[in-house]
């Protein structure tokens, strides 16, 4: 019995050429997957080892950073920071002082509004 012949239960006209059968056998071949599985396992082990090394180095760096006293700033840096703060405060004071209205005049205006609202209540607008 040849491979090109159909199976006994196949309908007529389903004859498969020998070349197609060989190609299908090669395409759907089954082989031992052990080398592939071992290579993936080795790759995963390498990734785990590298991750553990990096994690350990990160932990050690954090510990060293916590153990060291904070860096003292040089007097030049402190002087520059103070100068910046002083300049910003001066700018703020100048801005606020230049925009400060006359308080007596503001109080007088508020009192006039209150008096007018007491003597002349708002007349509700009527719709015509």
From Swiss-Prot:
Induction line: Positively regulated via NR1H4/FXR.
Residues in compartment: Extracellular: 1-35
GO cellular component: basolateral plasma membrane; membrane; plasma membrane; protein-containing complex
Compartments, record wording: Cell membrane
Gene Ontology BP annotations: bile acid and bile salt transport; bile acid secretion; positive regulation of protein exit from endoplasmic reticulum; positive regulation of protein glycosylation; positive regulation of protein targeting to membrane; regulation of protein stability
Ranges facing Cytoplasmic side: 57-128
Highest taxon in the source lineage: Eukaryota
Transmembrane segments: 36-56
Chief location category: membrane
Keywords, in A-Z order: Cell membrane, Lipid transport, Membrane, Transmembrane, Transmembrane helix, Transport
Membrane topology: Single-pass membrane protein
InterPro entries recorded: OST-beta_subunit, OSTbeta
Tissue expression pattern: Widely expressed with a high expression in ileum. Expressed in testis, colon, liver, small intestine, kidney, ovary and adrenal gland; and at low levels in heart, lung, brain, pituitary, thyroid gland, uterus, prostate, mammary gland and fat.
GO terms for MF: bile acid transmembrane transporter activity; protein heterodimerization activity
Catalytic activity of the protein: taurocholate(out) = taurocholate(in); estrone 3-sulfate(out) = estrone 3-sulfate(in); dehydroepiandrosterone 3-sulfate(out) = dehydroepiandrosterone 3-sulfate(in); tauroursodeoxycholate(out) = tauroursodeoxycholate(in)
Protein family according to the UniProt entry: Belongs to the OST-beta family.
Annotated disease: Bile acid malabsorption, primary, 2: An autosomal recessive disorder characterized by chronic diarrhea, severe fat-soluble vitamin deficiency, and features of cholestatic liver disease.
Complex and partners: Interacts with SLC51A. The Ost-alpha/Ost-beta complex is a heterodimer composed of alpha (SLC51A) and beta (SLC51B) subunit; induces the transport of SLC51A from the endoplasmic reticulum to the plasma membrane.
Function of the molecule: Essential component of the Ost-alpha/Ost-beta complex, a heterodimer that acts as the intestinal basolateral transporter responsible for bile acid export from enterocytes into portal blood. Modulates SLC51A glycosylation, membrane trafficking and stability activities. The Ost-alpha/Ost-beta complex efficiently transports the major species of bile acids (taurocholate). Taurine conjugates are transported more efficiently across the basolateral membrane than glycine-conjugated bile acids.
Domain-related comment: The transmembrane domain (TM) is the major site of interaction with SLC51A. The extracellular-membrane interface is absolutely required for transport activity. The intracellular-membrane interface is necessary for establishing the correct membrane orientation that is essential for the heterodimer Ost-alpha/Ost-beta complex formation and transport activity at the cell membrane surface.
Descriptive protein name: Organic solute transporter subunit beta
Species annotation: Homo sapiens (Human)
